[in-house]
Amino acid sequence: MEFSFSSPALYIVYFLLFFVVRQLLKPKSKKKLPPGPRTLPLIGNLHQLSGPLPHRTLKNLSDKHGPLMHVKMGERSAIIVSDARMAKIVLHNNGLAVADRSVNTVASIMTYNSLGVTFAQYGDYLTKLRQIYTLELLSQKKVRSFYSCFEDELDTFVKSIKSNVGQPMVLYEKASAYLYATICRTIFGSVCKEKEKMIKIVKKTSLLSGTPLRLEDLFPSMSIFCRFSKTLNQLRGLLQEMDDILEEIIVEREKASEVSKEAKDDEDMLSVLLRHKWYNPSGAKFRITNADIKAIIFELILAATLSVADVTEWAMVEILRDPKSLKKVYEEVRGICKEKKRVTGYDVEKMEFMRLCVKESTRIHPAAPLLVPRECREDFEVDGYTVPKGAWVITNCWAVQMDPTVWPEPEKFDPERYIRNPMDFYGSNFELIPFGTGRRGCPGILYGVTNAEFMLAAMFYHFDWEIADGKKPEEIDLTEDFGAGCIMKYPLKLVPHLVND
């Protein structure tokens, strides 16, 4: 094969030369880093992290090297946290030092260069947005105000399942349709005329961003060679389509009605955001812009659909596989909703055992087994080791929640363990952190989990269930697939049988 100066191989040669020279000139650090596996030149530990399920790979390495582990991912240093004690020390005791986000290339594109809550850097901007989220957009009072919306869409969800009575259906698809409908209604108030376009964009975006870390994230020195990636250009195109749709919706809303200065009980999320844009009721140093609003809406749609569908599917699997839990859930749900036409939000609040099942499922199958990476803002010490400024801090919450010293028989689905040992997953118990904790904990836990509980309650009230293809529950394939989250590699197929019409 003829070699030419336009060959990509030349870029690789340039990079290798640049990297070698840079490493030779780089002063040796005297910091005592946490223990970890031996590294190779150039790639660090990437050869040991290349498996399909990184949370399991990292746990195996942490079992050898300790719950605070250093790995080299290309040019980047990463500190891996793998037990509850280290999670508390790093994420709570040193919470301010690790309050920044590590922003990868894909995230930067999808968030208008780190706008919104998920990838914003720590400071006044993030503080203001989290206040809006926790006090107005996703507070307990606000989520309860959405119950009528959830109940309406639950009717459609149940009707959709009825159309499959006696026939196989894919649960993830049914759950996703319900979740897209509810998040669009809670954001925009009425049924969004562009909903179908938005759903297509979200699905395509999810597929393209399924592997969040790219070569340029691991080797920043190579970023100049990667900026013209086909995948990144496709992502930019999709985000521009979403931007056009959201901009039109915002402009139409502002033209159609005067934005209220006072908060209202029945206002949708867009109304809340526009009120903060126009009137800045919190008195912050700055007002949010249309770009902020669009970034927030997009992250809300992504978080409220994909991860919640995962939570619902895994919970359904675990309940069906455990005859004792299945019997108790059926009895509880049908006892509370006896002779009713529909399940209501206040019914769901009474379903204590079913909600324990959801909690236990998120322990075994967290939607994000590796919490969104943080970035260290300053050096700090843990047990004599230095967590260096600029390092990624990655919490393996799956490993934390599989610790046999905390959770007897950790891989066993046992909802009753929370009766014996009450703890919640809102971030104060470091043994159970499927949604993160502290300054970077997920502000939408209540909204997401409530929607999962609504769907499960409706499914167990209206239908009996069997596994498709004549399989027994214990024969369900639990193989995981890792992308934007941890999903079932083979989607759950069920056959519904109508009980309460």
Swiss-Prot record:
Keyword Metal-binding: yes
Class of enzymatic activity (EC top level): oxidoreductase
Tagged with keyword Ubl conjugation: no
Membrane protein topology class: Single-pass membrane protein
Coarse class of the protein's main subcellular location: membrane
Extent of the signal sequence: none
One Pfam family cited in the UniProt record for this chain: p450
Coiled-coil zones: none
PROSITE patterns cross-referenced by the UniProt entry: CYTOCHROME_P450
InterPro entries assigned: Cyt_P450, Cyt_P450_CS, Cyt_P450_E_grp-I, Cyt_P450_sf
Sugar attachment sites: N60
Described function: Component of the seco-iridoid and derivatives monoterpenoid indole alkaloids (MIAs, e.g. vincristine, quinine, and strychnine) biosynthesis pathway. Catalyzes the oxidation of 19E-geissoschizine to produce a short-lived MIA unstable intermediate which can be spontaneously converted into akuammicine or oxidized by Redox1 and Redox2 to produce stemmadenine and 16S/R-deshydroxymethylstemmadenine (16S/R-DHS).
Species the sequence originates in: Catharanthus roseus (Madagascar periwinkle)
Name of protein: Geissoschizine oxidase
PANTHER family linked: CYTOCHROME P450 71D11-LIKE, CYTOCHROME P450 FAMILY 71 PROTEIN
Membrane-spanning ranges: 1-21
Cellular component aspect of the GO annotation: membrane
Entry's family note: Belongs to the cytochrome P450 family.
Gene3D superfamilies: Cytochrome P450
UniProt-listed Enzyme Commission number(s): 1.14.19.80
GO biological process: alkaloid biosynthetic process; indole alkaloid metabolic process
UniProt gene name: GO
Cofactor(s), names only, from the UniProt record: heme
